[in-house]
């Protein structure tokens, strides 16, 4: 029988799955549940060493002899610090060593309780990875614990070998051994390239070919990659391809971009029918909350993430099984002719549903202003989308392939969008258009204080007197008082600041003015000065128009 502590069961199951089966056990009470579970499992070879200073070096010897990782487990407090010399040796000798420390619950650290000190991160730069496991009480705790353990154990041999530290808080009662077996756990595997000399990837290709419902999601990518026709033809028919404007030209063929609206329009039965079996992602952040929610609630059987750095990105909460550390385009071209030569129906099902969705034809609003700009953009320009409403509403409209799209989606904050766009435009010869909301603009208005902008800069400022996006958040009902603070209501205009900084200023109050101003704003020839078009709308009306459009999608 094993410990009833779920984080310990996850730990032991994943040590076994990742091939860490030689373990040095040090005495103690707080680590007794871990020791009992490890020692009681037939797949582990355990060694008892009393002195932690010696135990750490003993574990290094075990790892060196066979070339496979070894682990050392100690109790809480200064017992952990006694492993420090061995960890330093493992780090500089590049030995795969797992340090497992039992710990008191976080609430009891620095409270004069016995054998307590701040253990998470105690080895700092001398370990390749340090994780502090949660105690598991919810499904999210279990997912988080599993992910942290996979992250740590994968790092043992990632870009060279070295030690990792796993800290395990254990609450009392400590000695309840009621689990009859280890749980089935999700194991994440990393392929460092698809190289037969590095790892046999035949099994990976077999798994790829066994699925019929395959989805490819491309996140933000600040580049253009043109696939050769021979690759495009093979890849495009095999997957349902999804990307947003931020993905730019990085997809073989024509991707589905209105998937966020499609998911809203689908009935629950249709959503069930369209669940993918395999999702492969590459690129950066995905804007659509609806897609992320859909795949978290309806997880695929597998999620593979392809990236040059090999990071563990478990975006769909527990679906990640495989990390492929290589250039995503190299990966695509590698698998193109390893796929079974068939034409699955799944991609066409998505395409047929999405092409039937009505295009937005909206009355005067901040959404229609964005649409007017996108439809009139000159070829080969750059479009900078600020965060919050701007980047989301732009997704409602089709965008020419020749337009390069930029956005600060690393952290998705409203600060700095204007400064980033102006910096980009300063080093660019093409026309640069910026779409930005009022809060983001005024928060970053000192971007115009800099003198590094020219006539290739044109800013569409959407001013509806506050944070309109907060009006559309489901479940948020605001009183008059909270409304003022949450949405940051204001009556500010950019006119004086724009004119003082040398911009041509255009004020728009209705649809007729918008049509007229847009002609000047989007003309491909350079003007004598940069332009700010400030479009004033009513935030309550904007929210109502947006809701009406989504209601239309349902019918």
From Swiss-Prot:
<dbReference type="InterPro" id="IPR004433">
    <property type="entry name" value="MenaQ_synth_MenD"/>
</dbReference>
<dbReference type="Pfam" id="PF02776">
    <property type="entry name" value="TPP_enzyme_N"/>
</dbReference>
<keyword id="KW-0808">Transferase</keyword>
<keyword id="KW-0460">Magnesium</keyword>
<dbReference type="GO" id="GO:0009234">
    <property type="term" value="P:menaquinone biosynthetic process"/>
</dbReference>
<comment type="pathway">
    <text>Quinol/quinone metabolism; 1,4-dihydroxy-2-naphthoate biosynthesis; 1,4-dihydroxy-2-naphthoate from chorismate: step 2/7.</text>
</comment>
<keyword id="KW-0786">Thiamine pyrophosphate</keyword>
<dbReference type="GO" id="GO:0030976">
    <property type="term" value="F:thiamine pyrophosphate binding"/>
</dbReference>
<keyword id="KW-0464">Manganese</keyword>
<keyword id="KW-0479">Metal-binding</keyword>
<comment type="similarity">
    <text>Belongs to the TPP enzyme family. MenD subfamily.</text>
</comment>
<dbReference type="GO" id="GO:0070204">
    <property type="term" value="F:2-succinyl-5-enolpyruvyl-6-hydroxy-3-cyclohexene-1-carboxylic-acid synthase activity"/>
</dbReference>
<dbReference type="InterPro" id="IPR012001">
    <property type="entry name" value="Thiamin_PyroP_enz_TPP-bd_dom"/>
</dbReference>
<dbReference type="GO" id="GO:0000287">
    <property type="term" value="F:magnesium ion binding"/>
</dbReference>
<dbReference type="GO" id="GO:0030145">
    <property type="term" value="F:manganese ion binding"/>
</dbReference>
<comment type="subunit">
    <text>Homodimer.</text>
</comment>
<comment type="function">
    <text>Catalyzes the thiamine diphosphate-dependent decarboxylation of 2-oxoglutarate and the subsequent addition of the resulting succinic semialdehyde-thiamine pyrophosphate anion to isochorismate to yield 2-succinyl-5-enolpyruvyl-6-hydroxy-3-cyclohexene-1-carboxylate (SEPHCHC).</text>
</comment>
<keyword id="KW-0474">Menaquinone biosynthesis</keyword>
<comment type="pathway">
    <text>Quinol/quinone metabolism; menaquinone biosynthesis.</text>
</comment>
<dbReference type="InterPro" id="IPR029061">
    <property type="entry name" value="THDP-binding"/>
</dbReference>
<protein>
    <recommendedName>
        <fullName>2-succinyl-5-enolpyruvyl-6-hydroxy-3-cyclohexene-1-carboxylate synthase</fullName>
        <ecNumber>2.2.1.9</ecNumber>
    </recommendedName>
</protein>
């Amino acid at each position: 029988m094993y410990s009833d502590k779920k984080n310990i069961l996850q730990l032991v199951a994943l040590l076994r799955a990742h091939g860490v089966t030689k373990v040095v056990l040090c005495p103690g009470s707080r680590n007794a549940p871990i020791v009992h579970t490890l020692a009681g499992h037939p797949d582990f070879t355990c060694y008892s060493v009393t002195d932690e200073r010696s135990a750490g070096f003993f574990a290094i010897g075990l790892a060196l002899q066979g070339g496979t990782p070894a682990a050392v487990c100690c109790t809480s407090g200064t017992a952990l610090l006694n492993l420090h010399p061995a960890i330093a040796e493992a780090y500089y000798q590049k030995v795969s060593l797992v340090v497992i420390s039992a710990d008191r619950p976080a609430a009891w650290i620095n409270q004069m309780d016995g054998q307590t000190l701040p253990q998470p991160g105690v080895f700092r730069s001398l370990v390749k990875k340090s994780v502090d496991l949660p105690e598991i009480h919810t499904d999210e705790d279990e997912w988080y614990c599993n992910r942290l353990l996979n992250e740590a154990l994968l790092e043992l041999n990632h870009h060279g070998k070295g030690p990792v530290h796993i800290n395990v808080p254990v609450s009392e009662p400590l000695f309840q051994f009621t689990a009859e077996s280890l749980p089935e756990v999700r194991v994440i595997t990393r392929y460092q390239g698809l190289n037969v000399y590095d790892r046999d990837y035949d099994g990976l290709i077999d798994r790829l070919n066994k699925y019929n419902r395959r989805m490819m999601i491309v996140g933000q990518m600040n580049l253009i990659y043109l696939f050769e026709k021979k690759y495009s033809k093979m890849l495009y028919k095999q997957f349902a391809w999804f990307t947003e404007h931020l993905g730019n030209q990085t997809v073989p063929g024509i991707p589905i971009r209105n998937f966020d609206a499609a998911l809203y329009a689908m009935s629950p039965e249709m959503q069930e029918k369209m669940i993918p079996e395999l999702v492969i992602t590459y690129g950066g952040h995905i804007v659509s909350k609806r897609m992320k929610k859909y795949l978290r609630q309806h997880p695929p059987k597998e999620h593979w993430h392809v990236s040059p750095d090999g990071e563990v990105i478990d975006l769909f909460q527990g679906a990640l099984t495989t990390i492929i550390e290589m250039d995503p385009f190299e990966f695509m071209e590698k698998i193109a002719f390893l796929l079974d030569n068939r034409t699955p129906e799944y991609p066409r099902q998505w395409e047929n549903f999405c092409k039937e969705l009505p295009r937005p034809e909206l009355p005067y609003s901040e959404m229609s202003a964005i649409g007017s700009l996108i439809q009139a953009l000159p070829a080969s320009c750059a479009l900078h989308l600020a965060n919050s409403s701007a980047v989301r509403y732009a997704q409602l409209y089709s965008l020419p392939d020749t337009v390069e799209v930029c956005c600060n989606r690393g952290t998705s904050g409203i600060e700095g969008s204007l400064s980033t766009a102006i910096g980009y435009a300063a080093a660019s010869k093409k026309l640069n258009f910026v779409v930005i909301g009022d809060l983001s603009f005024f928060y970053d208005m000192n971007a115009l204080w800099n003198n590094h902008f020219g006539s290739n800069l044109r800013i569409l400022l959407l001013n509806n007197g506050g944070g309109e996006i907060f009006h559309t958040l489901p479940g948020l009902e605001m009183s008059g008082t909270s409304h003022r603070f949450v949405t940051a209501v204001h009556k500010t205009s950019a006119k004086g600041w724009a004119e003082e900084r040398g911009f041509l200023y255009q004020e728009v109050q209705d649809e007729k003015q918008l049509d007229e101003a847009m002609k000047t704003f989007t003309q491909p020839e350079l003007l004598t000065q940069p332009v700010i078009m400030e479009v004033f709308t009513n935030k309550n009306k904007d929210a109502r128009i947006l809701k009406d459009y989504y209601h239309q999608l349902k019918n």
